[in-house]
């Protein structure tokens, strides 16, 4: 039996001393705002929104990164509806996945907005993402900062996404293992 469940991406690590984020959901769906490439997010919303949701925008500050989402028992019907929506649109979705920005993340956000699901936005410490652009990953011996795990001082849940090719070949797997 459960009260709430966390859905987390495979490229994400939760620090063992992380506070209990379930205590911060207020009994609602909860996630962390996407804190990365806003051009990518806006383009993705426009692409998927226009084709599947009869809208090409919504407030980017409500766009949740799919790598950290908390649901509870009250969301069973909502999730069933999301799955039904996906199954109904899967052929068209599979044609655009890989061609457009994003995959399921944007569709989940657009569907959530369409359904007007009440949510709690959690602080970025629970899905610290886009670490490269925040200068929290060491990629080059000439960087002015030291080769340490700087991200440990900046959050509790580390999402190793959007890591560009780099001279030291340090990809998500490198950082997860380290």
Question: Where on the chain are the PLM-derived regions?
Answer:
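Short, flexible, basic/aromatic active-site loop/helix in glycosyltransferases
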Residues: 47-60
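Small-molecule pocket liners
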Residues: 28-29, 66-69
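An acidic intrinsically disordered interaction segment
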Residues: 36, 68, 76-78
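A glycosyltransferase accessory/donor-loop signature
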Residues: 59-60, 64, 73-178
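GT-A fold catalytic core of metal-dependent nucleotide-sugar glycosyltransferases
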Residues: 1-43
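Residue-level detector of short, conserved catalytic/binding motifs and their immediate flanks
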Residues: 3, 67, 156
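Short, basic and Ser/Thr-rich N-terminal targeting/leader segments
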Residues: 8, 64-65
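A short secondary-structure junction signal
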Residues: 16-19, 42-45, 79-84, 170
């Amino acid at each position: 039996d459960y009260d709430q469940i966390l859905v987390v991406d495979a490229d994400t690590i939760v620090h063992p001393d992380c506070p209990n984020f379930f205590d911060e959901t207020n009994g609602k769906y909860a996630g962390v705002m996407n804190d990365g490439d806003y051009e990518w997010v806006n383009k993705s919303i426009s692409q998927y929104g226009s084709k599947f949701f009869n809208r090409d925008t919504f407030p980017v500050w409500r766009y949740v990164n799919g790598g950290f989402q908390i649901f509870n028992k009250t969301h069973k019907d909502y999730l069933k509806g999301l799955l039904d929506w996906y199954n109904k649109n899967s052929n068209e979705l599979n044609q655009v996945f890989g061609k457009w920005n994003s995959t399921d993340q944007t569709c989940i956000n657009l569907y959530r907005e369409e359904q007007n699901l009440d949510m709690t936005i959690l602080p970025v410490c629970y899905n610290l993402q886009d670490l490269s652009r925040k200068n929290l990953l060491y990629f080059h011996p000439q960087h002015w900062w030291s080769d340490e795990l700087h991200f440990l001082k900046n959050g509790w849940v580390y999402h190793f996404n959007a890591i560009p090719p780099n001279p030291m070949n340090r990809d998500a797997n490198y950082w997860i293992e380290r």
